[in-house]
Regions:
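A glycine-rich helix N-cap at a beta->alpha junction
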Residues: 74-93, 177
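RNA substrate-binding interface of SAM-dependent RNA methyltransferases
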Residues: 4, 42, 49, 80-82, ...
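Short glycine-rich anion-binding loops that position phosphate/pyrophosphate groups of nucleotides
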Residues: 41, 62-63, 87, 107, ...
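Boundary-proximal intrinsically disordered activation/regulatory segments immediately upstream
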Residues: 1-70, 155-156
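Active-site/ligand-binding-proximal alpha/beta "capping" segment
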Residues: 195-247
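Short, aromatic/basic amphipathic alpha-helical patches
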Residues: 66-77, 230-231
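Glycine- and other small-residue-rich loops at beta-strand/loop junctions that grip anionic moieties
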Residues: 6, 36, 126-127, 152-153, ...
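Structured adenosyl-cofactor binding patch, chiefly the S-adenosyl-L-methionine
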Residues: 102, 140-144, 153-172, 229-268
Length: 268
């Protein structure tokens, strides 16, 4: 692998790490593919394990023979741009987590049909734009037995750098794609839908009918505006998490973890 010393803020080849927005990264190279940034040896290792293709590395000089050595070795002949901590921080605008970044090619996403095939518990993320929440939801999904994730187009991109980091690489462990259509379309794949919302006719999340469903799609939304009426109307169940001390709602990432645990498949 070529080790390339960065000598200036305009060094050729490093624009992918410091001059492109998330939207520009998504469109780089090939429309529909693009590039994303993974950071830290552990997260990059998970991406490589999942088959993601590395394109370039940026690494603090001191980590080349240290914590990033095994990542550099696994990435083969991709260029490794290096420099001191201060220069790389100035270039990227943030401190590199564990001293290393990896630009990776985006995969072709599976279709909804492929996502729903042979799955029993999926989550639909509706309009969640906060990167931290997206990352936390994916981490809980991976840990608590969710088979796949669907996201509405107005949700945050799961391959956003911060979302990937917060998820600790869990975005590479759970299949995901964008939702085409509405949650009602999931019925044709054999799913019943459970929308997490506070309504007068909602049922408690510990209702036995929910755990008994062989195929269930759990619909999560940011706690700000809640689920749109149309989404609630299309859902087979409207579900609430019972709360104490007058608290009326949880952050969407916390609510997702509760829902995934309560509604998990237990006969594995």
């Amino acid at each position: 692998m070529p080790i390339i010393e960065i000598s200036s803020l305009t060094h050729p080849g490093v624009d992918v790490f410091c001059m492109l927005t998330e939207a520009q990264l998504r469109q780089r190279m090939e429309p529909g593919k693009g590039v994303f940034i993974a950071e830290s040896p552990n997260v990059i290792s998970r991406a490589l394990d999942a088959g993601y293709e590395p394109l370039a590395l940026m690494c603090e000089r001191k980590h080349i023979s240290g914590s990033a050595a095994h990542i550099i070795k696994r990435c083969g002949d991709v260029p490794v741009y290096t420099g001191d901590r201060e220069l790389l921080t100035t270039l990227t605008g943030y401190v590199l987590t564990r001293g290393v970044l990896c630009a990776m090619r985006r995969p072709v996403l599976p279709s909804m049909e492929e996502i729903c095939r042979d799955t029993r518990r999926i989550v639909v993320i509706d309009g969640v734009v906060d990167t931290t929440n997206i990352g936390a939801i994916f981490r809980s999904a991976a840990a608590l037995g969710i088979d796949a994730v669907l996201l509405t187009r107005n949700s945050c991109d799961p391959l956003n750098r911060r979302a990937v980091r917060v998820s600790m690489g869990s975005v590479f462990l759970v299949p995901w794609t964008w939702l085409n259509g509405t949650i009602g379309d999931l019925n044709k794949f054999g799913f019943r839908t459970a929308a997490m919302a506070l309504t007068d006719d909602s049922i408690s999340i510990d209702h036995p009918i929910l755990a008994a469903e062989p195929r269930l799609a759990i619909v999560m939304v940011t706690e700000g505006d809640g689920l749109p009426y149309k989404t609630i109307a299309e859902a087979d169940y409207v579900v609430r998490i019972p709360m104490a001390h007058g608290v009326d709602s949880l952050n969407v990432a916390a609510a997702a973890a509760v829902a995934f645990w309560q509604l998990r498949i237990t006969d594995l």
